[in-house]
Amino acid sequence: MRRRVALLGTSAFVVILLSFGLSVARPAAAGRSSDGAADTPTPAAYRDDLQRSYRTDHYLEVAESGVDRGENIYWHKCWACHNKYQQAAPTLEGLFKQPALITGVPVNEENVAAHIKKGGPGMPSFRTTLSDSDVADVVSYLHSEKCCVEGEHLPANPWYRSETNKWTVQNGLTGGANGTVRVASGDSPEGVMVQLIAPNGVRTTVYTNEDGKYEFPKMQAGAYILRIANPLEFKPYRRDSVQIDGPTKLEEIVLERIAKTRALPATPEVEAQLSGEEILWNLPGTVEEKEALHNTCALGCHSFQQIFKNRYDERSWGVLVARMLHRGGGPLINDPLEPVSDSALATDKLVTKWLARVRGPESVDGPMYAFPRLTGESNRVVVTEFELPRALQSAHDVYGDGNGNIWYTSHLSRFFGKLDTRTGVVTEYMAPLTPGAQPGTHHVYVEKNGEVLISEPWSHKLLKLDPRNGEMVEVPVAAPFPINSAGMADFDVTPDGFVLASMGGGYAAEKIDPKTGKMVQKYPMKVPFSYDGVVSQDGNFWAGGAISGTFGNSAELLDIRTGQMLNLDSGDRKSAGRRGGFDPFGNAWFGGENGTLVELDAKAKRIREFYPPGPVEPYTDLYSVEPDKNGEVWGGELHGREFLRFNPKTGQWTEYAMPEPYSHSRAVWVDKSTTPTTVWYADYSTGRIVRIQPME
């Protein structure tokens, strides 16, 4: 629930904490509190080193400077065009062993840095978006023996400590440390996120009620970091070595505002705490311009922040827009699968000119306005964030097994794994490599016998893993596209053990034998494909949504028993259902890329859409949703910070704010064995696994 505050309209963004000792923003009052925690003064710049979004925006996910930070920047800025799987640009491994650059000048650090800053045909100029120190770190990385990172290997995540610091992860809702938050100016303290970070790096966040009170679940006794997560309009607050033992009463937290009004300074620290939809809402521009961005750049491959943190000239934005929008598949490796239309080129031009205006070298942001904090039932929730062993992970799907583990995939690397939710310890696996294919996994499914099925979309394979012995078997699955364009990605499994999937251009749902990868039956449909396909809980039906993107309006319902396919559409309204699942009543639900929950009503044989609270498209869009055992539907805002819960019986929406300004969920898994419901997702922007536990 949101507080009813009017949104002020605008004309419309050393190794990471190898120990807990890095100096960051802390409470203003110096000294030692009654619970033994050390306080130090808050610096003038309101930066919180524990804010993951800030570290992501500033390429601090792996290290503070040097070769390792250069690797971090390379992954975000260079890898997409210079990876070894593509042919359009030179690979950069061994660059300093070459006599000359493609411009003909000698290869040395000065000339390489100059080329990065200037750019060239097909390459943006980085001089206005990377600092001199950023470029120096990239050059040091290119000069090192580590270059160049591919999906075959990723750097270690310095925040993953569950193997070295053994610590039990809480699983309850109440009974732990508690206290009160007060705002010095007298403003409401409701909806403030209070967080404890355990020695193993696992973060637990709870939320204040209208009196400013909060309560953690009972946690293992010991020393924790206490902080305010995503403080945004407040000065950062952090206390180290806070001793927790059962229902410890914590000292009152007093927060100070960074501004006297809702207008926040447009500093990097503030913008890093805004969600993508908040930044887009703040930026100048027409609805046409913002809708053009939404239709082309909001499909889930990255956050809005990954766009808006940059400053490029118009030529460079044009290079990037062309590269991002007209390559085949997620890795952007293959040439366009079909010629680019005149209308698409016109949209490219519109997006390029708008980005150059609002995110050009000379553009200056006005004051930034954040959406109001949530109230009421929205704050009755516990959110837990688990670290994974690799940085730059691109964590995609999650799925629970019968032993309390969560399996996850990695979209652009060979690494996938199993998270022990009781300890935070991850068992990591590496998918076999396919020559010439970008490694990466997409959907994961755990069968009743414990065997794990994982799709490898870029190499066109189905991976089968036996967790008991680690044995892996890969089965090729034919696809209508070349490798490095997506083959089978999303799939589900029928009661008799066959895989059902729909691949691009096939105009069908396909029944596939997982032992051989061969299609055994084809069910024609009227559209090229359904991005997702899910099997009903009774195993009698398969449902698919629309094609990928914002322009689809279709949904399909297959009676598996008879082979009859029902094709539906939402007319001129583009419902754009992406990923989803069945509720207990036989209806399929999908996340709509144009901002709605999309229901395929099986009995009425029609598509329905439900609009969440908050601003509509182009600001709000969904990607993946999943019903729970009660029929309530859960899904994350693709470019927001809220996770949504919808009760179709009552029409009630409940929003839950995440501790980072992302709810970047490519897939949702609902644990139907718990009461209340427990929801899991992999945050694609932070590379963490997130657990949501509502109190009701």
Predicted regions mapped to residue ranges:
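Electrostatic cytochrome c docking/interface patches
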Residues: 35-73, 164-174, 201, 208, ...
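Gly/Gly-Pro-rich "capping" loops immediately C-terminal to redox-active cysteine motifs
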Residues: 64-71, 80-115, 302-329, 430-431
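The canonical Cys-X-X-Cys-His
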Residues: 70-85, 123, 138, 142, ...
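C-terminal capping alpha-helices of c-type cytochrome domains
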Residues: 127-159, 327-330, 335-367, 404-406, ...
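Structural motif
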Residues: 167-190
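Short, acidic Ser/Thr/Gly-rich low-complexity loop/linker segments typical of extracellular
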Residues: 197-213, 217
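A short, solvent-exposed loop/turn motif at the edges and junctions
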Residues: 199-201, 223, 227-242
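Blade-level signature of beta-propeller repeat domains, shared across WD40, Kelch, NHL, RCC1
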Residues: 663-696
